[in-house]
Amino acid sequence: MNRYMNNAVLTVLLLLSIPASADAMRCKNALITEGDSTAEMLLKCGEPMLREDITRNEENQYGNVVEVKYGERWTYNFGKNEFMRFVTVRNGKVIDIENGPRGE
């Protein structure tokens, strides 16, 4: 019986040690997930290393193609032992989180 309990505890600990999925990221002791506000992310993670506009071309009412800002891509670098994270934000909300290469 004791052996089964040890195995169960070990299994739970191993599952808890698995990194968060690609639609979430850990900042210090906080977790950021898709749908969180950018204000919440700034409080938990601080300023990103880089902010880039995401644009796309759209046709306006006069038939002209214009470049429209669609959102932003924020880059977080948590150091050389961690993966960089690319966070897409739009209208003040996190809409996507992607893993990048190892940080510097």
Q: How would you name each of these model-derived features?
A:
Residues 1-9:
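Bacterial N-terminal signal peptides that target proteins for export
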Residues 17-19:
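N-terminal signal peptide c-region/cleavage motif recognized by signal peptidases
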Residues 10-14:
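Hydrophobic alpha-helical targeting segments used for export or membrane insertion
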Residues 22-104:
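Residues within mature, well-folded domains
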